[in-house]
Amino acid sequence: MPTTPIPFTPLHMFRRLLCVGLFLFAGIHTTLGATLPLPSTSYKYTVLDQDLSAALQEFGNNLKISVNISAEVKGRIRGRIPELSPREFLDRLTDLYDLQWYYDGVVLYVSAAKEAQTRMLVLSSVHFSAFKLALDKLDISDERYPVRPAPGNGLVLVSGPPRFMALIEQTLNGLLAVAQAQPRATDTPARESVMVLFRGSSTTVVRGGRPEVFYTSEMLPENDDGGKAELSKK
């Protein structure tokens, strides 16, 4: 029976993104993609006539690997399969039956090639270099499924099997949430306050909380009628 997919919870994603920051700060380098733990010895598997999904499930059971097989994986294995290494055996079935597989570090996901998805993602406030680096540090990147930026770093084109695509979107959403949670510095300067205080025959202009100009009725310039001009409020 297929195993249940293990989703990343927001807390899980936050912890992994925090680890990414620590890796970047410390300058630690990791390999790309989660490594599928397969032995290098030959995998002996005798098949006469068996359902493809059952053979893949038995493959995982024999190697102590959790396997999630899509319902779209169909077919039967007939005939003898040569003695191969476990990785070669998996790749051979993938090529023969038009499949894709992806290992997320916990579960090996096998799906039909026709289930592959292609999406254009909007990076918004996240720069592509930061997005790609997060995928590498979280062991999500896979050289078989490239992530390509569009000119200007605002868009990214991603193609791959369903599990890979789900982790891509979860990572981007996590980075966007972290970016939105950070305080934003405002580029708009504070408006300067100006007050005009009238007290009897004197007038004081206060700009930015500081008295700046002091007038008396004798100091105001005369208008065209020979009277004192009035100081307008600002």
From Swiss-Prot:
Annotated membrane topology: Single-pass membrane protein
Keyword Cytoplasm: no
Subcellular locations according to the entry: Membrane
Keyword annotations: Membrane, Nodulation, Plasmid, Transmembrane, Transmembrane helix
GO CC terms: membrane
rRNA processing keyword on record: no
Transmembrane regions: 17-38
Name of the protein described by the UniProt record: Nodulation protein NolW
Organism for this UniProt entry: Sinorhizobium fredii (strain NBRC 101917 / NGR234)
Originating gene: nolW
